[in-house]
Amino acid sequence: MRATVVRYEIKPERADENQALIEAVFADLEERQPEGFTYKAFRLEDGVRFVHVVVEHDDVENRDSLADVPAFQAFVADIGDRCVAPPVPSGATVVGAYH
């Protein structure tokens, strides 16, 4: 499994808009049911920092891509305008998981 963690801070006046765009991504994912990855997004307690975690599963032969989801494309299209600073992606190793 390969994981990516993305952290960023949104301009306070755009935080609710950012959350709405994220919710649209999850609605699109629910409709499309892509396979091969797990995706979670978190809005931190301060209301302006967000964390996204994508885990790509090794056991799927024809993995779908989050980047192919139209609502995700809309979400990332102007992320730079909504952010205080550019998002910071980091590769991560899954040490453990519980469902």
Which residues does each PLM region occupy?
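Active-site-flanking beta-strand signature of metal-NTP-handling nucleotidyl enzymes
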Residues: 2-8
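Short, surface-exposed ligand-recognition loops at beta-strand->loop->(often short) alpha-helix junctions
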Residues: 9-20
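Short, charged/polar surface micro-motifs in flexible loops or helix N-caps
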Residues: 12, 47-49, 57-62
